Amino acid sequence: QTALAEAEIEYAEDPCDSIYVKFLVTDDKGLLTQMGADLSKTYFVIWTTTTWTLPANDAICVGPNFTYSLVKWEDEYYVMAEALYESAMKAAGKTGYQVVGTIQGKDLEYMKTAHPFIDRTSLVIVGDHVTLESGTGCVHTAPGHGVDDFNVCQNYPDIPVIVPVDSLGRMTEEAGEKFAGLTTSQANAAIAEHLKETGALFAMEKIIHQYPHCWRCKNPVLFRATE
């Protein structure tokens, strides 16, 4: 194990699971219910390729100038970017859905959601780093494990920086008793399985993506916020 300077990081193709996860809306500022949503079954759908960072999630970031759709499927409602919801629904194998309304990203700010397996609020925030290249336009945000995440959360001083991974790359008790002691790679599988069991897993796909690696040992890099 070693700390790396930014110049010592190189990108390499890395096979991984990409997962889509449902975060239940607990406060919609009255805006989604106006479109007909049942708040007990309304979710922001996030997408991530680093499942092990989900215990550190405490925000969902949207693009302030993007349009977001409220998509109804059966009796559930999903908030996703207008440009991306079709690919997400396809990944989930969901058909027969309809768009019941649209809303600007800036109007989603300060809505609240419930973390899918930790007793914690995940606040909806806005950031200019959000893109429409992949995912759902609703970015899983863990300021303890990502530079963009950390930087955008500086605009929201009430959002804590949670780092449930120790210096050896193992999950701590803060990740939850079910995952404590697991390596990050073990946690990827365990968390995905838990999400599936609890109904919070929206979809999962195998992909190959560009991920930062150590230029010396060629192993994937683990990002942690430190003092």
Describe each PLM feature range.
Residues 61-63:
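Short beta-strand-to-turn element immediately C-terminal to the catalytic PLP-Schiff-base lysine
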Residues 1-55, 67-69, 107-114, 120-121, ...:
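Residue patterns forming the tRNA-binding/recognition surfaces of aminoacyl-tRNA synthetases
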